Amino acid sequence: GMLNLANAQRYGRMGEYREDNTAILTNPCGEISLADKETCNLSEIFPTRCYGPEEFFNAIRYATLYSSTVALLPTHRRETNNIIMKNRRIGVSISGIAQWASGFNKEGWSKNMNYSEISKYLDSGYKIVRSENKRLARDAGVPESIRVTTIKPSGTISLLAGVTPGIHFPVSRYAIRRIRVGTQSPIIDALLNSNVPNEDDQFSANTKVFEFIIDHGPVRPCEEVSPWEQFALIRMVQKYWADNSVSATVYFDKESCKPEEIQKMLDLYIPELKSVSMLPHSGHGYAQAPYEPLTEEEYNKRVEETKIDFSNTKGNVPSGSVYCTGDNCVRV
């Protein structure tokens, strides 16, 4: 992985000088530059779940309202509050970009969606975030946010929306998605009784790794998207949308993509990015990897074999009155 701290401190969107000298590192996934003791404040929107541009732009307004409001809330630590009050940093993110570019969209979007069209929507969307954040900051009597947009990896949240994670292309249309579930979770019995394939987590005690199946729809898998195109897409999004960073992993074929070619990519794109990592499609050696390709036949077979029944699963666990009784409150 690579972090270009100079770019993170010097630029908002690439090419727009907007100083952020307090930033000294990023969060673990690399999408948000942070000062010492500063916190992340993220929200997320899904263009392929919107019925056209107007709904997309409205979703941007709501996400900006949410994050800008959260930026007003104090934490339990004075040093953190001080840097939050100074920067008011937020990160409105987008997921499902691969599906968006593939035309896998609801009615209201252009049938001929492409990167050029997306760049226009990103640029217009960014201006809405900036305008809304400035208005909200003025109404609250605080400085506008030093940074407002990002692309987070969204490996988990994207599953809830049924979209591809962040800027990433899927490993294949049909795939296994491995998810870690604690053995004390309310859903563990339903999963075990439904014969969802699972094994003990190799890295965490009292945790199971379950294999769920996904159909990403008619979108290109990362094996069909060259690393050059992936780098170019990251650069485009860093230029037109993200004034924080873009959290992205560029996938490549380690057999056909030689070290000299990878070096050329890094030499060309590192000066124009804030963060990026690279990983081979397969043979990477990571146990219990989040994604694994499936054939359509394997996918259909698992659909027939697995029927999960959550009807007896409770989402709440009663714990009594642990907060306030009369004039006395429990601090938790």
Regions found by a protein language model. Give the residues of each.
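Internal maturation/activation junctions in enzymes
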Residues: 71-78, 96, 101-153
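Catalytic alpha/beta core of large soluble enzyme barrels
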Residues: 1-5, 13-54, 60-76, 86, ...
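Catalytic-loop motifs flanking and including active-site residues across diverse enzymes
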Residues: 38, 93-96
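Short linear clamp-binding motif
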Residues: 329
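Alpha-helix capping and helix-loop boundary segments enriched in small/acidic/polar residues
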Residues: 20, 33, 54-55, 80-89, ...
